């Protein structure tokens, strides 16, 4: 009976250690996942800002050229 208790105690101890190691790895993996998501969101925002900025500059450039042509022809 005593040897059975020892072996069960040993199995419980080893199981507890392996479980704690798995939890540490899982939390480390979750941290990496959050960094990846943050990078993904940042790159998406950055790309959208570039697109909007280019379109605004094109529109401003067209308006500026039209305004200069208007001034040059004195039709404003």
Curated annotation (Swiss-Prot):
Tissue expression remark: Expressed by the skin glands.
Record function comment: Antimicrobial peptide with activity against Gram-positive and Gram-negative bacteria and against fungi. Has been tested against S.aureus (MIC=1.25 ug/mL), B.pumilus (MIC=2.5 ug/mL), B.cereus (MIC=7.5 ug/mL), E.coli (MIC=12.5 ug/mL), B.dysenteriae (MIC=7.5 ug/mL), A.cacoaceticus (MIC=12.5 ug/mL), P.aeruginosa (MIC=50.0 ug/mL) and C.albicans (MIC=2.5 ug/mL). Also shows a weak hemolytic activity.
Species for this entry: Amolops loloensis (Lolokou Sucker Frog)
Cysteines paired by S-S bonds: 70-76
Main location: secreted
Protein's recorded name: Esculentin-2-ALb
Pfam family, one: FSAP_sig_propep
Secreted among keywords: yes
Signal peptide region: 1-22
GO terms classed as biological process: defense response to bacterium; defense response to fungus; innate immune response; killing of cells of another organism
Family named by the database record: Belongs to the frog skin active peptide (FSAP) family. Esculentin subfamily.
Highest taxon above the source species: Eukaryota
Keyword presence, Secreted: yes
